[in-house]
Amino acid sequence: MLAKRIIPCLDVRDGQVVKGVQFRNHEIIGDIVPLAKRYADEGADELVFYDITASSDGRVVDKSWVARVAEVIDIPFCVAGGIRSIDDAAKILSFGADKISINSPALADPTLITRLADRFGVQCIVVGIDTWFDDATGKYHVNQYTGDENRTRVTQWETLDWVQEVQQRGAGEIVLNMMNQDGVRNGYDLTQLKKVRDVCRVPLIASGGAGTMEHFLEAFRDADVDGALAASVFHKQIINIGELKAYLAGQGVEIRIC
């Protein structure tokens, strides 16, 4: 059995780490490189960086901080933000990133997933999915350009359909960003995770809602996700990664202990 992964998420805007609630009202958390090093030292299995306005601004993630992060950490990290071509991805990987993640650009051009997977290998290609539960329809819908609340829009895709589509096109991993739960800290949406897990054959990462150590346990035990991503509980030092891993190991979760 592969060890479950604990993954801090760092949303980047204007060169700093920020955090919002339900993808809105972002506050500044701090500088990118010191936070990355802190999480690596605490025992994170990998890091994910989202340049949250790159896609909506029509630009690619700023590569300068990617190189600086690579210099100070020795764990894998994934970078997302406006990657629209093989050349964009190649440059980010050349600066030291281990994986690249695409989200809004994949919705705009689904063939991008296949082209990137063919060029760099599926293990390198992550697809992020921003999913929102609509009370009116009772369905989960995929959203696009969520880094800018003024440009966010609901797409034609229902979440489960898009999960299956991106797998067929070559996604090597899926990060499910559950927008209703984002920053609220009342637990991951286990109902949605179970539905996605039923149709997801590649590694599945839960994102959105972690507030306690028990929430991580529930995601691993009840929804069988491969990794749990969180931001505010780590940024605000509500949960220490080393202590979280010790707790999970004590509950029988296969986890890498530093």
From Swiss-Prot:
It comes from the Bacteria. Its main location: cytoplasm. It is found in: Cytoplasm. It is an enzyme of class 4 (lyase). GO terms for biological process: L-histidine biosynthetic process. GO terms for molecular function: imidazoleglycerol-phosphate synthase activity; lyase activity. InterPro entries: Aldolase_TIM (IPR013785), His_biosynth (IPR006062), HisF (IPR004651), IGPS_HisA/HisF (IPR050064), RibuloseP-bd_barrel (IPR011060). The active site is at 11, 130. IGPS catalyzes the conversion of PRFAR and glutamine to IGP, AICAR and glutamate. The HisF subunit catalyzes the cyclization activity that produces IGP and AICAR from PRFAR using the ammonia provided by the HisH subunit. This is Imidazole glycerol phosphate synthase subunit HisF. It comes from Salmonella typhimurium (strain LT2 / SGSC1412 / ATCC 700720). The gene is hisF.
